[in-house]
């Protein structure tokens, strides 16, 4: 199977996201690469499902919360950028501050 560098990147993101999903389901807090992969995969899937760039920029901020990542990770991830394939071509989706820190999250 011959894959382009972009296709290899997407497969690596997907693989890391699957691992992150399994850990999240077990209640294990995600580290930096797992959190970025999890958010990135959600954006890539959303693009394949037909969501717009604007919808994905909003959606990307709802995928993970403060309690699902290790301490300090939400502050480390200032933005996530993903090149996603849409029906009209490839576009860069940027999600700023994807893991929002909420007071009620800290109490859980």
UniProtKB/Swiss-Prot annotation:
Gene3D superfamilies: Urease, gamma-like subunit. GO terms for cellular component: cytoplasm. Keywords: Cytoplasm, Hydrolase. GO terms for biological process: urea catabolic process. It comes from the Bacteria. Belongs to the urease gamma subunit family. Pathway: Nitrogen metabolism; urea degradation; CO(2) and NH(3) from urea (urease route): step 1/1. This is Urease subunit gamma. It catalyses: urea + 2 H2O + H(+) = hydrogencarbonate + 2 NH4(+). It is an enzyme of class 3 (hydrolase). GO terms for molecular function: nickel cation binding; urease activity. Heterotrimer of UreA (gamma), UreB (beta) and UreC (alpha) subunits. Three heterotrimers associate to form the active enzyme. PANTHER family: UREASE. Its main location: cytoplasm. Its EC number is 3.5.1.5. It is found in: Cytoplasm. The lineage of its organism: Bacteria, Bacillati, Cyanobacteriota, Cyanophyceae, Oscillatoriophycideae. CDD domains: Urease_gamma. It comes from Trichodesmium erythraeum (strain IMS101).
């Amino acid at each position: 199977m011959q894959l382009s560098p972009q296709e290899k990147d997407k497969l690596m993101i997907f693989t890391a996201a699957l691992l992150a999903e399994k850990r999240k389901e077990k209640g294990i807090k995600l580290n930096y690469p797992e959190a970025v992969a999890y958010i990135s995969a959600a954006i890539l899937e959303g693009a394949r499902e037909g969501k717009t760039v604007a919808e994905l920029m909003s959606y990307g901020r709802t995928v993970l919360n403060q309690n699902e990542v290790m301490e300090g990770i939400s502050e480390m991830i200032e933005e996530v950028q993903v090149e996603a394939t849409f029906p009209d071509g490839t576009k860069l989706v940027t999600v700023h501050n994807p893991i929002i820190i909420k007071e009620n999250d800290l109490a859980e």
